[in-house]
Regions:
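Extreme N-terminal starter segment of soluble prokaryotic enzymes
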Residues: 1-4
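Active-site and donor-binding regions of nucleotide-sugar-utilizing enzymes
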Residues: 6-31, 35-131, 212
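A donor-sugar binding/catalytic signature common to diverse glycosyltransferases
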Residues: 13, 20-24, 237-286
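A short helix->loop->beta-strand "cap" motif at the edges of active sites that frequently abuts
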Residues: 100-104, 203, 269
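A nucleotide-sugar donor-handling region in carbohydrate enzymes
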Residues: 109-192
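Donor-nucleotide binding loops and adjacent catalytic segments primarily
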Residues: 167, 174-244
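Conserved phosphoryl-transfer catalytic core
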Residues: 287-299
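C-terminal amphipathic helix plus adjacent low-complexity
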Residues: 296-362
């Protein structure tokens, strides 16, 4: 089976990260020839080892990476996956419609836990002017969706990393014995309030951070208001394959976007989701919908989880108080996060579920 994946990079690294992870799974785990068409190879190169964005097309880890424009003169593969509703080149769409047999055309959508997703998952959508269907495929956290991307060796790698955790944190001059929080959020997050909460609590803590605007804000706050109880460990940007180690090394996570949101859930660690802000507070509705899904798994600690997440994204509650409760109930949330991960694993990997769906349409 041959596969084309189209990636229109719009927001930071999230779009590229999701597409690269899917392409890698299809290539490395299933052995399928995969072409990834992308409009911003420069962004992809920052999270993909061995990719020179100036030398396209190229083969990286078994995946053929092409400039988006290459599709205009290419023939479709047996499966064509457009991600997040990106519009394919018109000439390529015509080739899909004319091919015999027609390729299976998939629109891989954004992850959402909202109720309506279950009713739209796997539905066909006729092209407005061509005689061809494409199918909506939704990642999700219920049995009636496509699940999440889970590599076959993910948990083996996490288990192996446990013995290297201390050395990993020490490489950032952090004390492995201290409570460690990984912070990967948008610059608009309530970082001043968070820093204030850490100072007021007074207990020693490690902050593990990737380089970026949010890290610069926290560093400036530290310069203005030094605090002996807060230790910083700042990392340069790393390949996607190394990102999980930062989650595994931490006790609690603050993450953003979609790909890191999924990886946080699969790490089995309590997390705060800095969801991408949208107009009319649409993002808050998405956050609350996700909260309803995990509520049965978090039980007694759920109110603490949702209050902290709403505080982070809406600034409608006292963050200092929420953080104190978060730290107090961390043991309960750790157990809940692992139960939630077990549930996600039971849904199967998105890549496997997508392949099963494709085979049912051939």
């Amino acid at each position: 089976m041959t596969i084309d994946i189209f990636c229109d990079v719009i927001d930071n690294f999230g779009d590229a990260g999701v597409c690269w992870r899917l392409a890698s799974i299809f290539s490395c785990e299933h052995g399928f020839p995969v072409k990834l068409y992308i409009n911003d190879a420069e962004t992809l190169s920052k999270i993909t080892a061995g990719l020179d964005p100036k030398k396209l097309p190229c083969l990286v880890q078994g995946v053929e990476i092409h400039d988006w424009k290459d599709a205009e003169t290419s023939e479709p593969s047996q499966v064509v996956i457009e991600t997040f509703g990106c519009r394919l080149p018109i000439a390529f769409e015509h080739k899909i419609a004319a091919a015999r047999p027609q390729p299976i055309w998939i629109n891989l959508e954004y992850l959402s836990a909202e109720d309506w997703v279950e009713g739209c998952h796997s539905l066909p959508s006729p092209h407005p002017s061509l005689n061809v269907n494409k199918y909506y495929f939704f990642p999700g956290v219920t049995k009636k969706t496509g699940g999440l991307m889970i590599e076959k060796d993910l948990f083996i790698r996490q288990e192996r990393f446990a013995k290297d955790r201390n050395k990993f944190l020490e490489s950032f001059n952090l004390d492995p014995a201290l409570f460690t929080v990984f912070v990967f959020c948008y610059p608009g997050a309530p970082l001043a309030e968070f820093y204030k909460a850490l100072r007021q609590r007074g207990k020693e803590i490690n902050l593990l951070l990737p380089k970026g605007a949010a890290t610069d804000i926290l560093s400036k706050l530290y310069e203005e208001h030094p605090s002996r109880n807060i230790q910083f460990g700042v990392s340069k940007m790393v390949p996607q394959s190394e990102f999980d180690k930062f989650l595994w090394a931490s006790d609690s996570l603050i993450i953003r976007g979609e790909d890191s949101f999924v990886r946080a859930q699969l790490s089995g660690k309590p997390f705060i989701w800095n969801i991408y802000p949208q107009t009319e507070e649409t993002h808050i509705k998405k956050l609350e919908a996700f909260g309803e899904r995990i509520c049965p798994y978090y039980g007694e600690s759920y109110q603490t989880w949702i209050d902290m997440n709403l505080s982070w994204n809406k600034s409608s509650r006292d963050l200092t108080c929420c953080w104190e409760r978060w730290c107090h109930e961390l043991p309960l949330m750790k157990e809940a996060a692992q139960h939630w991960r077990d549930h996600l694993v039971s849904l199967g990997s998105l890549a496997d579920n997508l392949l099963s769906f494709v085979k049912s349409k051939i």
